[in-house]
Amino acid sequence: MDFLKRICLKRISAAGEKTSPGLLRRGVREMVRSYKGPDSRRGDVLILFEMDYAQIASALYGLRRKEMYRDYMEICGSLHTVLQKCAAGTIPAVFAANLYGEACLLAGAFEEALRIFTELEEETRDLDGPDNGFQLRARYGMARARQGLGRYEEALRDLNDILVRRARRLPPDDPRILAGMARAAGAREQMGQDRQAAELYRTLYRKSRRAFGEDHPFTLRCLAGAEKAEE
């Protein structure tokens, strides 16, 4: 695996993209730990997935810098290869589909993102018990896609439902809960509910200041969101 990780990091460097080595390591480690496909396919699936994860992670960071369509097409080709090699219903297949949906969101392909996350939500309902992390992540992707399509009321309903479900399993200041609250505040602002959005941003500001510190970027974004909504 060390040899493959060196290949992954070399590919990222060659692509000239900036990515987080921690993100790569966590993704690869989780993929290796949780793979449950047939033993006969384990070797080639893990090799393909590890190499393609590096390429995908690299391209995703490129998308965030607005280099959208070139990288988006590269991701699609890479993910088709991975998904064909992964046994259906396995953790690697779910992980690859999540990355594909994320790439669609970043590239502005919201209809395709909604399709892939809707399929994922259905496929992962019974994967690890009710309200499992895979299912809630897919629901969150659906909400983001609907928000991108301007379907703010539907997105807000999804986000509020996700927050209730995550609150059953996670501490109140968990970053996933805070991120969901921030997106819900944004949806309210887009719907013209400025007062409710400002209240939510203020609550987020207090939570983030306590959890991350007063000068943390997320804390400052929450404060800026509250001030903007109050204008």
Where are these regions (language model features)?
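Intrinsic-disorder-linked linear interaction elements in eukaryotic regulatory proteins
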Residues: M1-E231
